[in-house]
Amino acid sequence: MDAKTDDNSAGKCPVAHGSAGRTNRDWWPNQLNVQILHQQSSLSDPMGEAFDYAEEFKSLDLDAVIKDLHALMTDSQEWWPADFGHYGPLFIRMAWHSAGTYRIADGRGGAGAGQQRFAPLNSWPDNVNLDKARRLLWPIKQKYGRKISWADLLILTGNVALESMGFKTFGFAGGRADVWEPEQDVYWGPEGKWLADERYSGDRDLQNPLGAVQMGLIYVNPEGPNGNPDPLAAARDIRDTFARMAMNDEETVALIAGGHTFGKTHGAGDASLVGVEPEGADIEQQGLGWASKFGTGKGGDAIGSGLEVIWTTTPTKWSNNFFDNLFGFDWELTKSPAGAHQWTPKGGAGAGTVPDAHNSAKRHAPSMLTTDLALRFDPSYATISKRFHENPDQFADAFARAWYKLTHRDMGPVARYLGPLVPKEELPWQDVIPVVDHVLIDEQDAEALKAEILASGLSVSQLVSTAWASASTFRGSDKRGGANGARIRLSPQKDWAVNQPAELAKVLDKLQAIAKDFNAAQTGSKKVSLADLIVLGGNAGIEKAAKAAGHSVDVPFWPGRMDASQEQTDIHSFAPLEPTVDGFRNYVSGKQRLTVEEALVDRAQLLTLTAPELTVLVGGLRVLGANAGQSKHGVFTKQPETLSNDFFVNLLDMGTEWKATSDAKDVFEGRDRKTGEVKWTGTRADLIFGSHSQLRALAEVYATADAKAKFAKDFVVAWTKVMNADRFDIAG
């Protein structure tokens, strides 16, 4: 008998829209997602391995691009007419929203990869009609091609927009290389609906690492919290969300007032007449969304946020008029034509002072958002706003600096900045590291220093732990942290609990003494920095541990790191880099949003590691004794400080049965199946390599009888990658 076939239940093409079979994540939604370690690979990159964006950008005629952008600002297109005959305000919003997703907690978001082109950002409610802004830019991107990335072009266009309306910007740096697929590692919130706010608990406590109040918003709801038009409540939301982007009160006021000096919001009619976002639109829309059936759907009939606000009398010219109007009128609550809460001057004041965006015969009164009034009624914001109102030069300088910080915050050290418009001034938020000012040590010096380090009495565990603690702060998201700068000896890092401050101080004292003696013995300008010596010490420890396991390895080393000063280290800015959970070191502190194993993969992604690299590093760090507090969890070996594959061999031993020691299931005992004797203890960060099928497959590679040499070799490669993660001055 022939089997029945059912087109509705049979296997489907895995790329079919809406008809693919259930994925593993559908069946097991709590399954650990290691796929975030394999995104942005060469398989999705059309540019090829030889493509070097930095070199392409250096050959770009930047002046020509800027000239073309200036021309575009007033070249209004019939298919999407420019408000007030000038696209500048639209492009400022585009650039702001490209950069404004950045959050300091994990360094994710921001403008650095051009993610506004992809879902979900291209379809967020707060990014309504920015699809048109990017389409307006396409002829310029098409003209200059690979020499300027979308990521750089979005920000440069925002700068040119400001300049074209009479504002002097602080500077611009290129160097943001595009990616070619949506980022899968960014947690945007738990909600399943746009504008929902399940991210709050308690007394409006916003979940970390989030930086926006509702799903699909960049920062705050302009109508006030959940649409409640309360300026003081809005101020609380503003302060929280902007702080999560590393902005203080002065920078916050400058950004809001500066941005709202220009342009308008769009709420000409019933928002229900607006169609779906780009990702949900029909194929013939060609990636555009929010098609509106209200009037012409564009120009004077455009609907975006639903608010219909024009702040100033000169919306395409830099001025202090935002503050003139903010303080010059008493405001009363009203509603836009789309029904959104906004504010207008009482008693009809200000009527006729503001131009219409598309009809020169019309005039209006100015209007404000609830979040604008927060700058007047919140005491701290009001003090700053009044000062800016009375001192326009201070306002302009503050906005220029805050805009530069907003648009460059996720680029990492200045060494990555490209182009002739990079300012010379060093800024505290740039994590400044001194330029190399001495002759670097050579290979012979490095060998001598390693021998001296090993003779100092420092153990393999101490050396490896210190080097790892120094380097593993790196975040590939915003290119912060890492071993360069030796900030592990400075506040706040030297006092982080995960770094075992007392033990760390002993190691650093010995390494500093070795560096001091070496430098004093030189007759020329040759020196070794502590930053280099910390990494070199870790390498020495690994080579010693490998030798103990019967392997001869040379851990690669490139000198050239420098030591930053405490004055070059913003304690408040560095605080979010402190790990509260670190599976690489089997460390957990307090309640976490993520499980230990999720946090381990998240940390690996920030370190730009692959799943094999994550696996081999955890196995190696355990046997080398790198656990915080010298915990024995996961140290599955009888030969500690030996670079063996024992972690994997013993984890996968079927003679061991694992059981949780408490209902929390965070610590486990591995008992001999026959005798019941406790052989090992481990955490979720250990047992996940035997539990998760993909990680177990990798663990099996390193547990085989012929894998000892491969394990040592692969560990060294992965270790070196982490040690050099922040070395933007060297190739590879």
UniProtKB/Swiss-Prot annotation:
UniProt keywords, alphabetically: Heme, Hydrogen peroxide, Iron, Metal-binding, Oxidoreductase, Peroxidase
Organism for this UniProt entry: Mesorhizobium japonicum (strain LMG 29417 / CECT 9101 / MAFF 303099) (Mesorhizobium loti (strain MAFF 303099))
GO BP term, pick one: hydrogen peroxide catabolic process
Protein's name in the database: Catalase-peroxidase
Assembly mode: Homodimer or homotetramer.
EC code(s) of this entry: 1.11.1.21
Covalent link (Tryptophyl-tyrosyl-methioninium (Trp-Tyr) (with M-245)) residue numbers: 96-219
Active site: 97 (proton acceptor)
Keyword Ribonucleoprotein recorded: no
PROSITE patterns: PEROXIDASE_1 (PS00435), PEROXIDASE_2 (PS00436), PEROXIDASE_4 (PS50873)
UniProt family annotation: Belongs to the peroxidase family. Peroxidase/catalase subfamily.
Location of cross-link Tryptophyl-tyrosyl-methioninium (Tyr-Met) (with W-96): 219-245
Cofactor(s) the protein needs: heme b
